Amino acid sequence: MTIWVNQKEHLYDAPLTLVDLVKQLGKAKKTGIAIAVNNSVVPKNNWGNLMLNDQDKVTIITATQGG
């Protein structure tokens, strides 16, 4: 199935949860991450329950520090 992550196409085998996607992208241990699926923010405690579907659009935002 095709999942769009930050406007880039990625191909995955189904089924795939949001937490599976985060792990495959190497972001599982990072903090300060917010994720929206199809323009709806998903609370972190729901990442393991949300099944992704073909053509879903995932936006991952990572907080950064600076000055």
Language-model segment annotations:
Residues 1-66:
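Ubiquitin-like/PB1-type beta-grasp interaction modules and other compact soluble beta-rich domains
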